[in-house]
Amino acid sequence: MVKLRLKRVGKKFHAQYKIVAADARSPRDGKFIEELGHYDPHAKKLTLNKELLTKYLDQGAKPTDTVRTLLKQEQFYSNYIASKK
């Protein structure tokens, strides 16, 4: 099963995260399928590749709770769900 989740990168005490599509069994910072965006919690900056996100969500990938919250803040997830109805 494919999950959309955060992969930690950056320096110690200054974490940044990549939003990736990864197998649910792989470790947090391990192998991933594709990078879909990145998030800097210190600068509150979120960058998304909306075409790739839509592709993986259409194929059945499940976002983790944190990624779902970030997508809702960008109004991406609610727009995606509304377009599916």
From Swiss-Prot:
**What is the similarity comment for this entry?**
Belongs to the bacterial ribosomal protein bS16 family.
Lineage runs: Bacteria, Bacillati, Mycoplasmatota, Mycoplasmoidales, Metamycoplasmataceae
Task: Provide the GO biological process annotations.
Answer: translation
Q: What is this protein called?
A: Small ribosomal subunit protein bS16
Print the keywords alphabetically.
Ribonucleoprotein, Ribosomal protein
* Alphabetical list of SUPFAM superfamilies matching this protein: Ribosomal protein S16
Q: Which GO terms describe its molecular function?
A: structural constituent of ribosome
Pfam families per UniProt: Ribosomal_S16
Q: Name one GO cellular component term.
A: small ribosomal subunit
Give the gene symbol.
rpsP
| Domain of life where this protein originates | Bacteria
